[in-house]
């Protein structure tokens, strides 16, 4: 949409709610659907949006650039009174626009001939002219078997990794209405594509000259997702102007967004600090699904709602997102395994997108396009909702029976509240042990908790009323505080690394040879819990300390688990890691290495390190796993860990000298390019910022700046040019909450599971998974529906999606009295080749057929991999035959279809019984099917076949079969077009 002078309108600051990409503005008068809105942020930035819903006294506004940074108090919303319009002109031909309709090709400003509402209107059925004119695409499988007709809506159903982009570009280059070539134009709109895809389309159109008669509209994957809702409408508005105001025949090609899914077992990090496998989130949410849950053996997905909030990025830092919908999808046969330098390993669908670093900054790239050396964005410091559990909470979660022996003050407080202890027990329906002496009276832990809630305000206070806790035996545990502190968490780290917990037999053990660690363990356990440890020594001189207590066994079962520690404050995480390093780590050569025998435990330790802002590498060796921290990160970690092992503490103290950088110190490639732009814009010399050669190498990409060097450059730049926007962006790149994790291996693998899983999160559409990798999900229509809290339809899409799609597709057609026409070919990438996915499924109901791309044909090297059997053009009969293509076209197409179908059936039979069991007739049909695919379906990417060439090729293939088998073609047509008779006729004429 072109920039225009800001229109006058009513301004409001009465925002009551911000949800995903939407905001609710109260007290609005006279707002109308589709009205353009300007949103001014607290920093003065102006964003654009439109009214999605107008109520009596409120309006729901969809913000195109997203709602990040908006608040409900100081954000201003201006209702312009205008609908979303774009300037149109025949000068748009040959131009490249972004998803908002703004030129991005560096060409001259477009002088508008008119301004049109992008929502337009479907063609009035009474004014429609029935489509009947052939459009030649130059592709035999379409022209010969599934003919495109002027004014038709004919979608292409594809899948991830199939060459739909190449096919779309070829159709755009070659398509024409025979005899009216000068009046034919293409409007090509791509939504949610990668930069590589955008570069491909630009190159294809520019180098072949096709751009001269085309308008190219590109919405990139890292553009605001809300643009994807308006991009196809902008494309159709341009097409309507060219068709119905300038008498052109316009082919509109629309590419669609994809879906992204994970393998089960992928670990998702939640805002509460839990690490939950994605399939667990989906299955748990499905229990509350609106239509009864996930049905086994079906690709139909039920949408559930969950209270899970995930960590999300990317706007330079972490946020939290609501999980609003879930999916469980039958898995494809293939997936992509991605391994990174840090040790992260993910198995995802081929179209799943990761946040990758480039010279232009972060952008989303599909897994199938990743390559070794790419750098993925990962979180440097995990920030979660912190919580330290009380000892009572830890014990209440266990199945064991524990007994609380209260203080006298407890029963006095209960009696004061209820009149007597007996009355309190009756009201709470608890047993009253009247015969027991007060000093021997006890309560089961759950009983005590129920009584305590009546006389205390917090769980912490309950500990004050506890004398001691037992597990039914004599071993008493006295808690010195309600919750574990740094000392206890240090012991938990010792136990996790070099100890054990046995909840069955009820003991905790720690073994080591270092006296300082043994003493620390004994002293802390005695001081914090009032228990003693027994000591033994084995034949190797290793001292083993054992605490016999079922109570402490249950406490340390939880506290020694890194997943529990992940939610705790930074100082407790550091204390735990100090115990772990003292017990089973070593410091040497500027590295800190923590060793474990368990792969999952190693991943948990990496997450704990990221709670401290420390990235690490996971390495496997001889059945063990090392978590390694190097460079500046190791030195900073050494300073923060309260180590007690004498030698390790000494090594940590000396680690601050001779610090070296690691790969995780690198800043984004964007830093160098932006630095050069800033220097040129403000006339800053390289020598003003440091070594000229260093600055030059960073700007050219020869050298990568470390975080520290980048920050030094930024600080010097601030002294020279001040606090300007570009320098603020450089600072964000220098000290942002990210690390770059290099991809070391990408491989296509056979998928081993039955299902893939997906969650829809709003508003940021990203998840933090595994050890901090940032990855994507969500589709725009589903996002809006979730943000509006609408009753979800299939797979999280709104129930009105059929209507929404129809408002796009029904803008195609021919109008009586108008020469021009609009033909649509939307391209839909079916998630996991699932034709029942809501978008292709509903598209099939609205449109007039479909072209289906085959993964099997693609694997066999056939381009374009069009499977003609499930493909269909419902208007084909109206656009072919005598006077349109050729008289033999209808019968020839039917015969080719029937023969190919029989050949395909025989191919399946051969797989069972072998070719030897076939008759001679069967072998001819089998040969026909092979030749049909290799000669008719397959053609060059630049091969433009005329309809005559396509039909003649069809007759050549039918010559493989006996004439008696050509039952769908008349004898007259056989005598006229069959190669045998045509050859005789040509010989006679000669």
UniProtKB/Swiss-Prot annotation:
Membrane topology recorded in Swiss-Prot or TrEMBL: Peripheral membrane protein
InterPro entries: ATP-synt_VA_C, ATPase_a/bsu_AS, ATPase_F1/V1/A1_a/bsu_N, ATPase_F1/V1/A1_a/bsu_nucl-bd, Cro/C1-type_HTH, Hint_dom_C, Hint_dom_N, Hint_dom_sf
GO molecular function annotations of the record: ATP binding; DNA binding; endonuclease activity; proton-transporting ATP synthase activity, rotational mechanism
Membrane-spanning residues: none
A matching Pfam family: ATP-synt_ab
Ranges where the DOD-type homing endonuclease domain occurs: 491-614
CDD domains named among the record's database cross-references: ATP-synt_V_A-type_beta_C, ATP-synt_V_A-type_beta_N, Hint, HTH_XRE, V_A-ATPase_B
Family note: Belongs to the ATPase alpha/beta chains family.
PANTHER family, sorted: V-TYPE PROTON ATPASE SUBUNIT B
Function per UniProt: Component of the A-type ATP synthase that produces ATP from ADP in the presence of a proton gradient across the membrane. The B chain is a regulatory subunit.
Protein name as it appears in the record: A-type ATP synthase subunit B
């Amino acid at each position: 949409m072109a920039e225009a002078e800001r229109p006058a309108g009513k301004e409001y600051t009465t925002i009551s709610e911000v949800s995903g990409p939407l905001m609710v503005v109260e007290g609005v008068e006279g707002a109308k659907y589709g009205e353009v809105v300007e949103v001014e942020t607290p920093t003065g930035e102006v964003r654009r949006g439109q009214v999605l819903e107008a109520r009596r006294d409120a309006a729901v506004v969809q913000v195109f650039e997203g709602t990040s940074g908006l608040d409900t108090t100081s954000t201003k919303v201006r209702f312009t009174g205008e609908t979303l319009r774009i300037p149109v002109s025949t000068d748009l031909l040959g131009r490249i626009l972004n998803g908002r309709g703004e030129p991005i090709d560096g060409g001259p400003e477009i002088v508008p001939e008119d301004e049109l509402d992008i929502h337009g209107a479907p063609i009035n059925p009474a004014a429609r002219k029935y489509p009947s004119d052939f459009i030649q695409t130059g592709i035999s499988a379409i022209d010969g078997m599934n003919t495109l007709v002027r004014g038709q809506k004919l979608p292409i159903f594809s899948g991830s990794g199939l060459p739909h982009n190449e096919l779309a570009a070829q159709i755009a280059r070659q398509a024409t209405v025979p005899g009216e070539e000068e009046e034919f134009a293409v409007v090509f709109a791509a939504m949610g594509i990668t930069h590589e895809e955008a570069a491909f389309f630009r190159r294809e159109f520019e180098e072949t000259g096709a751009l001269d008669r085309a308008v190219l509209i590109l919405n990139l994957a890292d553009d605001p997702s809300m643009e994807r809702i308006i991009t196809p409408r902008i494309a159709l508005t341009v097409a309507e102007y060219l068709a119905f105001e300038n008498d052109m025949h316009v082919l509109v090609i629309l590419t669609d967004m994809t879906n992204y899914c994970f393998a089960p077992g992928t670990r998702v990090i939640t805002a509460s600090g839990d690490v939950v496998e994605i399939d667990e989130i989906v299955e748990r949410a499905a229990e509350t699904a609106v239509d009864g849950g996930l049905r086994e053996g079906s690709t139909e997905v039920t949408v559930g709602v969950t209270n899970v909030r995930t960590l999300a990025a990317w706007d330079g830092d972490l946020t939290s997102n609501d999980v609003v919908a879930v999916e469980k999808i039958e898995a494809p046969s293939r997936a992509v395994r991605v391994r990174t330098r840090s040790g992260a390993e993910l198995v995802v669908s081929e179209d799943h997108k990761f946040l990758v670093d480039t010279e232009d900054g972060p952008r989303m790239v599909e897994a199938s396009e990743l390559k070794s050396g790419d750098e993925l964005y990962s979180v440097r410091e995990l920030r979660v909702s912190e919580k330290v559990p009380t000892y009572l909470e830890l014990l209440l979660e266990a199945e064991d029976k524990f007994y609380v022996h209260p203080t006298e003050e407890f029963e006095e407080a209960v009696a004061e509240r209820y009149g007597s202890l007996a009355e309190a027990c009756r009201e709470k329906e608890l047993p009253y042990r009247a015969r027991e002496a007060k000093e021997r009276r006890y309560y089961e832990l759950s009983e005590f908790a129920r009584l305590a809630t009546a006389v205390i305000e917090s769980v912490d206070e309950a500990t004050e009323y506890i004398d001691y806790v037992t597990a039914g035996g004599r071993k008493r545990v006295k808690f010195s505080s309600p919750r574990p502190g740094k000392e206890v968490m240090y012991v938990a780290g010792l136990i996790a690394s070099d100890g054990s917990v046995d909840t069955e037999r009820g003991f905790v053990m720690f073994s080591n040879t270092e006296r300082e660690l043994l003493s620390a363990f004994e002293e802390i356990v005695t001081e914090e819990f009032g228990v003693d440890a027994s000591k033994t020594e084995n034949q190797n001189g290793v001292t083993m300390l054992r605490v016999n207590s079922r109570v402490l066994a249950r406490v340390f079962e939880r506290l020694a688990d890194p997943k529990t520690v992940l939610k705790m404050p930074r100082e407790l995480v550091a204390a735990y890691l100090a115990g772990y390093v003292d017990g089973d780590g070593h410091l040497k050569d500027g590295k800190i290495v923590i060793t474990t025998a368990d792969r999952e435990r190693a991943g948990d330790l990496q997450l704990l390190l990221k709670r401290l802002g420390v990235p690490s590498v996971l390495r496997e060796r001889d059945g063990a796993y090392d978590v390694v921290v190097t460079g500046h990160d190791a030195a900073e970690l050494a300073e923060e860990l309260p180590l007690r092992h004498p030698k390790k503490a000494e090594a940590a103290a000396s680690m601050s000298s001779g610090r070296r950088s690691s790969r995780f110190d690198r800043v984004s490639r964007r830093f160098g390019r932006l630095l050069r732009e800033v220097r040129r814009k403000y006339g800053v010399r390289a020598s003003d910022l440091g070594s000229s050669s260093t600055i030059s190498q960073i700007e050219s990409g020869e050298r990568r700046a470390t975080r520290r060097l980048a920050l030094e450059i930024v600080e010097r730049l601030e002294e020279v040019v001040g606090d300007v926007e570009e320098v603020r962006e450089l600072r964000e790149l220098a000290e942002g909450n990210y690390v770059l994790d290099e991809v070391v291996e990408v491989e296509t693998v056979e998928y081993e599971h039955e299902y893939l899983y997906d969650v829809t999160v709003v508003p940021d559409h990203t998840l933090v998974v595994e050890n901090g990798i940032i990855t994507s999900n969500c589709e725009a229509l589903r996002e809006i529906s979730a943000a509006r809290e609408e009753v979800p339809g299939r797979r999280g899409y709104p129930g009105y999606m059929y209507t929404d799609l129809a408002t796009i597709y029904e803008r195609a057609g021919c109008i009586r009295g108008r020469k021009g026409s609009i033909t649509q070919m939307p391209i839909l990438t079916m998630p996991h080749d699932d034709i029942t996915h809501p978008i292709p499924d509903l598209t099939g109901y609205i449109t007039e057929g479909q072209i289906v791309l085959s993964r099997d044909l693609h694997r066999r090297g056939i381009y374009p991999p069009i499977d003609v059997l499930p493909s269909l053009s419902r208007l084909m009969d109206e656009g072919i035959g005598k006077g349109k293509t050729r008289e033999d076209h209808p019968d020839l197409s039917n015969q080719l279809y029937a023969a190919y179908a029989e050949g395909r059936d025989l191919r399946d039979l051969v797989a069972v019984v072998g070719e030897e069991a076939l008759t001679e007739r069967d072998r001819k049909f089998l040969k026909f099917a092979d030749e049909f695919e290799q000669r008719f379906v397959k053609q060059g990417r630049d091969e433009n076949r005329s309809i005559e060439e396509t039909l003649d090729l069809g007759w050549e293939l039918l010559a493989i079969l006996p004439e008696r088998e050509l039952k769908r073609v008349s004898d007259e047509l056989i005598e006229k077009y069959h190669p045998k008779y045509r050859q005789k006729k040509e010989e006679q004429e000669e």
